[in-house]
Design a protein with these regions (language model features):
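Bacterial Sec-exported substrate-binding components of ABC uptake systems
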Residues: 2-4, 13-74, 177-205, 268-273, ...
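A local structural motif
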Residues: 48, 61-66, 101-109, 231-242
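Short helix-initiation/N-cap motifs at beta->coil->alpha
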Residues: 55-57, 110-117, 240-249
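A short, structured surface patch at a secondary-structure boundary
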Residues: 73-120
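Alpha-helical, coiled-coil/dimerization segments enriched in small aliphatic residues
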Residues: 95-100, 216-245
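Proline-aspartate-enriched helix->loop->beta-strand connector
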Residues: 125-131, 147, 253, 257-261
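Extracytoplasmic substrate-binding proteins
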Residues: 145-211, 296, 308-327
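Structured C-terminal subdomain patch of bacterial secreted/periplasmic proteins
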Residues: 259-327
């Protein structure tokens, strides 16, 4: 009997040990996975459908991506051309050769730079009109037809004004990245010219030749980018700032004796050339200057400097001309 009882006790102990081991081996209950986030990603802000543009003649509300664009300012036309933005109407009468494609019949002729054809422009129902100094007097009348923005460059703050105008176009047409890239290239060239202009023998006089007469331009003038942005030292700092420049004599040029003489030929640009600027400038008096003696009379392309300017194409070309002219 005792033996039987001992055997039963051993069997019970063994069963208890097995149950205990199985309990120990059982995996612990897994920790619940964190619930998936239900927060939606932040929505990208919608692009504005209208911009309020501040300019020299006021403020103008313009819808973004305007389809029918009328352009009087050739500098702005070359910016639009560079960015691949189509226009509807252009003042075709004085187009510079590098913008000759806009003489095509697919572009409406909107009058001359001084006399807009208001009736024709109104019939086009434009979404945007871009003007500059030659159309100042027509601003109010054009504004009755469509949103009108003044995009002429302020000569006293040339690069800031040019940059602002370029960025306005970038925002209006969704071309910000392209505008920034072009501006970066231009600024790199400016740095290169600044380094050249730092030399002590680079004093310059800027002139315009028209009808056999010569006028001078200095800092703050329409051609003052040479001094104000490119840092070329003026041969005379106190030149009258006016649209048509300060009337000067050939004796004046000899007196100032510039190391560089920059010349813009107005008559070539407007098609009234009887004599070239070179024939007028390179006379016996001017031949006494350092500029002539050292081969540093630089004839600038009036299509950029006189007819247009202030655009992505023209400003780059203007700076490049000065860069090549400085030795």
């Amino acid at each position: 009997m005792l033996v039987c009882m001992l055997m039963l006790a051993l069997v019970a102990a063994a069963c208890g040990s097995t149950a205990s081991n199985e309990t120990a081996k059982a995996p612990a209950a897994s920790t619940p996975a964190p619930a998936a986030s239900t927060t939606a990603p932040a929505a990208t802000p919608a692009a504005p459908t209208e911009l309020t543009i501040k300019h020299q003649l006021g403020e103008t509300k313009v819808k973004t991506n305007p389809k029918k664009v009328v352009v009087f300012d050739y500098g702005m036309l070359d910016t639009l051309d560079k960015l691949g933005i189509e226009v509807t109407g252009v003042a075709q009468s004085s187009l510079p050769p590098y913008l000759a494609k806009y003489k095509d019949a697919k572009y409406k002729n909107i009058g001359t730079l001084q006399e807009p054809d208001f009736e024709k422009i109104s019939a086009m129902s434009p979404d945007l009109i871009l003007i500059s100094g030659r159309q100042n007097a027509s601003y109010a009348e054009l504004s009755k037809i469509a949103p009108t923005v003044f995009v002429g460059v302020d000569a006293k703050r040339y690069m800031d004004s040019f940059t602002e105008n370029s960025k306005i176009i970038g925002k209006l047409f969704g071309k910000e990245a392209a505008v920034d890239a072009e501006l970066a290239k231009i600024n790199e060239t400016i740095k290169k010219v600044n380094a050249k202009a730092a030399a002590p023998d680079k004093k310059a006089l800027i002139t315009l030749v028209s009808g056999g007469k010569v006028t001078a331009y200095g800092p703050g003038s329409r051609f003052g980018i040479i001094h104000d942005v490119l840092n070329v030292v003026p041969a005379e700092k106190n030149i009258e700032v006016s649209t048509h420049g300060q009337s000067i004599s050939f004796e004046y040029i000899v007196e100032k004796n510039p190391d560089y003489l920059f010349v813009v030929d107005r008559e070539t640009a407007v098609g009234e050339s009887k004599t070239t600027a070179k024939q007028v400038i390179e006379n016996e008096l001017v031949k006494k200057t350092n500029a002539y003696k050292n081969g540093n009379i630089v004839y600038l392309d009036a299509n950029y400097w006189y007819l247009s300017g202030g655009g992505l194409i023209s400003v780059a070309a203007m700076i490049d001309e000065v860069d090549k002219g400085l030795k």
